[in-house]
């Protein structure tokens, strides 16, 4: 169990450990789905068919029939992906183009739901095969969480832990609920109700709520993509511009960061837009910082250190105490610093 107030900041590299796409892979997947073209104007020969079905539903609800402007917006995104830092950056650039934003969200939603379905932690017949993938950070985190915990302690197991994930997937919530159920031999309902107590911020939204979470569009982890629910799921994804306008969520997220005693960055790229979202306005607690910098150059690691310090500086007062960065993946960082973190 974590004794210090801890915030985990999670990026795409962390979900990569369970088989979800990182930046370039996600851009490639989105390109394939949004490069929508037709032979003779009728027979679709490229792009995602379910997205096209969703477009027909969208324009029909608008009282229109022509999906070509939306398809064109999709092709614009597809052609620009090799130039983009990420799909998030591209949508931020074109935040005033409603068609591009809509198509980008549809591409993200379809790609992530498909990736969840093929991920290592997709529960086959309702059960995750924990033996097949013991060396993922999700498993190591749960072992740290459960260390010295007895059944009577379960209600407070998440008291000192929160997550900020910049990923659209639900890997964290999905895995933890299944892990608690199997390890502590409790019912699925009990495990899910416990996991509801874990604070998980999704600054850019998520591809639907898990059925047991309630609120919003309900989508099971690994569920087959439906063209009917895809527009609603896409509606739960937020661009950087939209998220900056969500004052209540940002205030709560930054309060958790400000009140933490340690911050652990896992598979995170430390991009400037995201660091801006993480920047705290006030603070009174010095923090230990641990982060992965897998495959980063020495100059970029120095820049990362500066960006983190800036995000944790208020009125010229810096609140970073110890800083440790490891050129490895998330699971190795948790294992190597286990005794320092719990």
Question: For each predicted feature, which ranges?
Answer:
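SIR2/sirtuin-family catalytic core signature
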Residues: 1-18, 23-29, 33, 41-49, ...
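Active-site periphery "cap/insert" segments of enzyme catalytic domains
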Residues: 2, 45-198, 250, 254, ...
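Terminal, non-catalytic protein-protein interaction segments that mediate quaternary/complex assembly
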Residues: 9-12, 35, 141, 154
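Short, flexible loop/turn elements at secondary-structure junctions
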Residues: 13-14, 145, 165-170, 204-207, ...
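Short catalytic/ligand-binding loop motif for oxyanion handling, primarily in non-cytosolic enzymes
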Residues: 16-19, 171-174, 208-212, 272-275
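Acidic, low-complexity terminal tails and accessory targeting/binding regions
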Residues: 190-193, 207-210, 340-342
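Short, conserved secondary-structure transition motifs
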Residues: 197-212
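Flexible internal linker/loop segments at domain or repeat junctions
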Residues: 201, 214-251
């Amino acid at each position: 169990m974590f004794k210090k107030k801890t915030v985990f900041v999670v990026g795409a590299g962390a979900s990569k450990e369970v088989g979800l796409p990182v930046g370039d892979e996600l851009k490639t997947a989105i390109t394939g789905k949004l490069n929508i073209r037709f032979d003779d104007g009728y027979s679709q020969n490229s792009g995602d068919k379910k997205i096209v079905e969703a477009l027909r539903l969208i324009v029909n609800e608008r009282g229109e029939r022509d999906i070509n402007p939306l398809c064109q917006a999709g092709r614009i995104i597809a052609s620009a992906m090799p130039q983009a830092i990420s799909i998030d950056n591209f949508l931020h650039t074109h935040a005033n183009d409603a068609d591009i934003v809509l198509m980008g969200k549809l591409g993200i939603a379809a790609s992530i739901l498909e990736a969840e379905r093929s991920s290592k932690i997709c529960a086959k017949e309702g059960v995750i095969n924990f033996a097949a993938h013991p060396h993922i950070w999700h498993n190591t985190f749960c072992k740290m969480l459960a260390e010295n915990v007895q059944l009577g302690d379960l209600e407070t197991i998440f008291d000192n832990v929160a997550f900020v994930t910049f990923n659209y997937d639900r890997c964290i919530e999905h895995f933890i609920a299944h892990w608690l159920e199997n390890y502590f031999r409790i019912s699925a309902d009990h495990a899910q109700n416990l996991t509801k107590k874990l604070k998980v911020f999704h600054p850019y939204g998520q591809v639907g709520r898990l059925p047991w979470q309630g609120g919003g569009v309900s989508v099971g982890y690994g569920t087959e993509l439906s063209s009917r629910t895809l527009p609603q799921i896409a509606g739960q994804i937020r661009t950087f511009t939209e998220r900056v306008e969500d004052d209540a969520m940002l205030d709560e997220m930054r309060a958790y960061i400000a009140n933490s005693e340690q911050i652990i960055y896992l598979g995170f790229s430390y991009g400037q837009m995201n660091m801006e979202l993480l920047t705290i306005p006030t603070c009174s607690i010095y923090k230990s910082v641990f982060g992965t910098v897998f495959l980063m150059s020495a100059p970029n690691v120095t820049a990362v250190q500066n960006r983190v310090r800036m995000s944790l500086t208020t009125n010229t007062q810096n609140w970073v105490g110890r800083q440790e960065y490891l050129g490895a993946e998330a699971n190795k960082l948790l294992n190597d610093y286990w005794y320092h973190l719990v």
